[in-house]
UniProtKB/Swiss-Prot annotation:
Its EC number is 2.7.7.8. The keyword Metal-binding applies. One of its GO terms (cellular component) is cytosol. PROSITE patterns: KH_TYPE_1, S1. It comes from Bacillus cereus (strain ATCC 10987 / NRS 248). The keyword Glycoprotein does not apply. This is Polyribonucleotide nucleotidyltransferase. GO terms for molecular function: 3'-5'-RNA exonuclease activity; magnesium ion binding; polyribonucleotide nucleotidyltransferase activity; RNA binding.
Length: 712
């Protein structure tokens, strides 16, 4: 293998993708620099030389954003990147999920894959470059990785599928799909869609897989040219004699324990069998390694029996049929002071979602590598330890919580009304109160209920369901509404959310090779049936969004002003707008096109603020009549306030019909008089007349008197 710099290129969606090896990060087991358009990502893979003494595969995938990639300096006092952004965490998960299944069972060496985003071209996805780079870094290294994998983004514009759409194309697309896999099979899907039919989503997945095959062939050429020989690694294996001994002791009782229907009772029964076996070996003074192997064998017994029952005997751990959904229960409006709340329970999974409405100024500001600067719709997901009856420290959200929150956000966003139709920021928080599988989908259902309770005029209600698959040889069973054990021990986790009209979000992780199109199609159709059942239940609780918002939600008035007048409303250094806010207690948000949003929980204060702004931007027209207060008196006339912020002069000669010797003889400060605008000079000064109106009144009276005399 050569250590010289080598460059490989391929066309990807009309833009050149280049891979450079042999120059950067040469002490890593594998490293590549991927350039896609002007996007550049350095991906590295490193592994420990010895296996770790753990009972899982210690893989870490990091997608690291650097703000220099878009020519920005980080905000704040420290001026360096801090904790990863939500987008970076989601990208790390996106890369981790298709890579993780491609390491051999029993491989316990620590592996770290790091992708550093060094330059960003918004039309060339840094996530897709990082996914390809991560796969290549592992593939050309000596780490025993059974790849390569590749990923592709698929959009749909006017019915035509597009690979890796540009920013402009993404705005027109009704599908936002990321698909990843090997040359033989898909193993990861992440999608958002605008109520798209299941058949179309399946076509999009297959379209993306065709592009994946081409990218994998490209990677295989690079591996052939620069790849290292894979190192021999000792895989973790249990002792054969110990395996037989434990199985003889535990299998029969474990099979009975697995078929206990209730979750906690089943866990207790399984743990009782485990405890008895462990105590037997502890009595024989078995060392820690032996006890670790015993635990591994017991886990395999549970896994094998659960899978056998599902695939061969068609029996699920809780006794349900394959397409049966657990009992459903829902409530809305259970928290009095919140703007909207929804409680959704499915079996032993329960989510309480709360909807909060805010002004447009409450949007989340995004300071990242993307073009999006803010978002007005947010969904946050919390998974406290008590939801599974455990104790652990209460810390901030982890990767899983951020991922589940983002999935819910993606599922619900297509049905959120536009800013024009509903000028509010919407924040949803889903608190998982009980967990036995499918909590992310329960949070979607709970959030729909909460928004309908809050009076958000959704385009359509959304429900979500998690599907599973257990495949053994030719036998397979698709499961609707999987619970925790089925998710953990099964071959597929397939989450589908949508409305009655189509899919809005889809997330799939597959742990096995060779999943056929037919199985995927069957799973999607079975998910649709389940989704419709859940939607019917939800609509029986609240049929449509409430017509009135909560008394505690902000009321928003929308008005439009001339964009040239925005600076008058804001005033020097914000003096004018801050004065209005201080006087009325409202929030004011002004768009560049002159749209003004005024919000507070007090409608009277909203109206007051609107009146003040109307007065500030109001244009005085010649011929208009005003009732104004005298603000100042000079020798030459009186200054009259027509409305807030606008004065005019009544010259002494225009105060009365008769000649006026002294202004104070007619008006004094504080008097309210009626005046007419007779001129606006070139300097914008407003000249007023009281005399004109008095003369008009005099003429009317004279005409009336004349008519009266004629009638006599």
């Amino acid at each position: 293998m050569s250590q010289e710099k080598q460059v490989f290129s391929i066309d990807l969606a009309g833009r050149q993708l280049t891979v450079e090896t042999g120059q950067l990060a040469k002490q890593a087991n594998g490293a590549v620099l991927v350039r896609y358009g002007d996007t550049a990502v350095l991906s590295t893979a490193t592994a420990s030389k010895e296996a770790k003494n753990v009972d899982f595969f210690p893989l870490t995938v990091n997608y690291e954003e650097r703000l220099y990639a878009v020519g920005k300096i980080p905000g704040g006092f420290i001026k360096r990147e801090g904790r990863p952004s939500e987008k970076a965490i989601l990208a790390s998960r996106l890369i981790d999920r298709p890579i993780r299944p491609l390491f051999a069972d029993g491989f316990r060496n620590e592996v770290q894959v790091v992708s550093i985003v060094m330059s960003v071209d918004q039309d060339c996805s840094s996530e897709m470059a990082a996914m390809l780079g991560s796969s290549l870094a592992l593939s050309i290294s000596d780490i025993p990785f059974e790849g390569p994998i590749a990923g592709a983004t698929v959009g749909r514009i006017n019915g035509e599928f597009v690979i890796n759409p540009t920013v402009e194309q993404q705005e027109q697309s009704d599908i936002h799909l990321v698909v990843a896999g090997t040359k033989d099979a898909i193993n990861m899907v992440e999608a958002g869609a605008d109520q798209v039919p299941e058949e179309t989503m399946l076509e999009a997945i297959m379209f993306g897989h065709d592009e994946i095959k081409r990218l994998i062939a490209f990677q295989e050429e690079i591996v052939q040219a620069v790849g290292k020989e894979k190192s021999e690694v000792k895989l973790y294996e249990v002792d054969a004699d110990l395996n037989q001994s434990v199985r003889e002791m535990a299998e029969k009782d474990m099979h009975s324990a697995i078929q206990v229907h209730e979750k906690h009772a089943r866990e207790d029964a399984i743990n009782e069998v485990k405890k008895r076996v462990i105590e037997h070996y502890e009595a024989q003074e078995a060392d820690a390694d032996t006890l670790g192997q015993v635990n591994e064998i017991l886990y395999k017994i549970v896994k094998e029996e659960v899978r056998r029952l599902i695939t061969v005997e068609k029996i699920r751990p809780d006794g349900r049929k394959g397409d049966e959904i657990r009992p459903l229960a829902s409530e809305v409006g259970i928290l009095s002071r919140t703007h909207g709340s929804g409680l959704f329970t499915r079996g032993q999974t329960q989510a309480l979602s709360i909807c909060t409405l805010g002004a447009l100024g409450d949007v989340q500001i995004l300071d990242g590598l993307g073009v999006e600067e803010s978002k007005r719709f947010m969904h946050h997901y919390n998974f406290p330890s008590f939801s599974v009856g455990e104790t652990r420290p209460m810390r901030g959200p982890g990767r899983r919580e951020i991922g589940h929150g983002a999935l819910g956000e993606r599922a619900l966003e297509p049905v959120i009304p536009s800013e024009k139709d509903f000028p509010y920021t919407v924040r949803l928080v889903s608190e998982v109160l009980e967990s036995n599988g499918s909590t992310s989908q329960a949070s979607i259902c709970g959030s729909t209920l909460a928004m309908m309770d809050a009076g958000v005029p959704l385009k359509a209600p959304v429900a979500g369901i998690a599907m599973g698959l257990v495949k053994s040889g030719e036998h397979y069973t698709i499961l609707t509404d999987i619970q925790g054990m089925e998710d953990h021990l099964g071959d597929m986790d397939f989450k589908v959310a949508g409305t009655a009209h189509g899919v809005t979000a889809l997330q799939m992780d597959i742990k096995i090779d060779g999943l056929s199109r037919e199985i995927l199609e069957e799973a999607l159709q079975q998910a649709k049936v389940g989704r419709m059942h859940i939607l019917d239940h939800m609509l029986s609780v609240i049929a449509e969004p409430r017509t009135e918002l909560s008394a505690y939600a902000p009321k928003i008035i929308t008005m439009t002003i001339n964009p040239d007048k925005i600076r008058d409303v804001i005033g020097p250094s914000g003096k004018q707008i801050n004065k209005i806010i201080e006087e009325t207690g409202v929030k004011i948000d002004i768009e560049q096109d002159g749209t003004v949003f005024i919000s507070s929980i007090n409608q009277e204060m909203n109206d007051k603020a609107k009146k003040i702004i109307e007065d500030i931007v109001r244009e005085v027209q010649v011929g208009e009549i005003y009732e104004g207060k005298v603000k100042r008196v000079e020798k030459f006339g009186a200054f009259v306030e027509l409305f807030s912020g606008k004065d005019g002069l009544v010259h002494i000669s225009e105060l009365a019909l008769e000649r006026v010797g002294k202004v104070e003889d007619v008006v004094k400060i504080g008097d309210v008089i009626t005046v007419k605008v007779i001129e606006i000079d070139k300097q914008g000064r407003v000249n007023l007349s009281r005399k004109v109106l008095l003369k008009e009144e005099q003429e009317k009276e004279a005409a009336k008197e004349e008519n009266k005399q004629e009638q006599q």
